[in-house]
Amino acid sequence: MKKFASVISVLLICSMALTACGSSGDKSTGGSTQQSGASQGAASSQGAASTGDSSGYTFRTSADNKVVTENGTFTKDSIEYPVLITSIGQSADVSMLDALMKKVGADYTFNATASADDVANYKTVIIACGASSKGLGAAGISQEDELARANAIAQTAKDNGITVIAAHLGGASRRGALSDQFNDIALGVANYVMVVEEGNDDGKFTDAATDKGVPITLLHSIADAITPLTELFGA
């Protein structure tokens, strides 16, 4: 019963994040330090990936097996502090990630629009990848400027040996031509990948993780991200 209540709580938090995602100004909340996170719009579809049936992809997760990790493991020992959460693409997913990290009591800084110079001050960066045209508009950022920012962050991570976790939590609505530009940047520098499996129905994320030889955790739903996040960042 407690587990069921916890899942319901996470779902409610994520739902609220969709309608009131992101904030501006500096604000400390829970275990996180809130910094100049852009106001996020509701999730908007950038084009859905092909279905699993047509792509030949076989889903690993199910209602009975909600979290599946492949290509080895990524453990708490792999995390170095301080930790930053940021977005590339400015989707509402970064606010849902923020809500989940608060739920597990993680110690981190949240800044949805962090610059490459900001990123250089951290040892671990969790990137919520996938684009939202509404989110970009709300943040007053053009697609071109956001791509330049994303590439600069990726280069900084490489140059400074920063551990990168790519978190793709928006499912099929964070796929398509625009979103995949940001997804590819995150995958290119990721040491670990978390993906809601609906967004991997063409095998994009599993293929990239296999090619790079990095662990990937497939999630049946966004609420299931609480499991790996607790294992990695829980007190």
Task: List each model region and its residues.
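Bacterial N-terminal signal peptides that target proteins for export
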Residues: 1-8
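Bacterial lipoprotein signal-peptidase II cleavage site
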Residues: 6, 18-43
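Hydrophobic core
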Residues: 12-17
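Charged, low-complexity C-terminal accessory regions
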Residues: 22-27, 52-76, 199-235
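Short, charged N-terminal beta->alpha structural module
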Residues: 76-103
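A short, well-structured beta->alpha microelement
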Residues: 101-121
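A short, gly/pro- and small-residue-rich
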Residues: 136-161, 209-216
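Structural recognition of alpha->loop->beta junctions
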Residues: 176-207
